A protein has these predicted regions:
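C-terminal binding/interaction regions
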Residues: 2-19, 69-136
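Small residues (Ala/Gly/Ser/Thr
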Residues: 10, 27-28, 40, 58, ...
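Short beta-strand scaffold segments in enzyme catalytic cores
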Residues: 23-32
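Short acidic/polar mixed-charge low-complexity motifs
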Residues: 34-36, 111
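Phosphate-handling active-site elements
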Residues: 36-37, 64-71
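C-terminal structural segment of proteins
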Residues: 37, 42-44, 86, 91
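Compact, glycine-rich, soluble single-domain proteins
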Residues: 41-57
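Feature captures the catalytic cores and cofactor-binding loops of soluble hydro-lyases/lyases
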Residues: 57, 61-65, 92
Length: 136
């Protein structure tokens, strides 16, 4: 799948976003090494802590479908003039399953920003930190 096709899949998801508070629809498309694509949109709630971002929606759909590895890249789109990069929580969630993930963020005009997850979340907290901890 080309970058543009993956971004188009993410843009398609924006129409499903539930964003009565921010009015900022975000779409995401998470691609796997076998070509499978899991999509997601952001879903807001009056209790703001209960909101979920598009990136995590796509990841949770993949996990609930039995996928645990093989994620290669994710496209993230919003309607702003700037790039819609994954938030810190999304970066942390994605790093649990795909530390080498490529992130494509597209702005409203179609420009693409390309980064590795390791660039956006250097020295991330992971399961290895828990394995090396002393609990008492």
């Amino acid at each position: 799948m080309t970058d543009q096709e993956l971004i188009a899949r993410a843009r398609e998801m924006q129409k499903y976003a539930y964003v009565p508070y921010s009015r900022f629809p975000v779409g995401a498309a998470l691609e796997c090494d076998d070509g499978t694509v899991y999509t997601g949109c952001n879903v807001e709630n009056a209790s703001y802590g209960a909101c979920i971002c598009a990136e995590r929606t796509a990841l949770v759909k993949a996990i609930s479908d039995g996928r645990r590895k093989g994620f290669t890249r994710i496209a993230v789109v919003g309607n702003s003039a700037g790039f819609c990069q994954p938030c810190g929580i999304c970066r942390q969630m994605l790093s649990e399953f795909a530390p080498d993930l490529e992130i494509l963020a597209a702005d409203a005009s179609g420009r693409i920003s390309r980064h590795s997850l390791r660039e956006l979340l250097p020295e991330s907290f992971g399961s290895d930190a828990l394995e090396n901890s002393s609990n008492g």
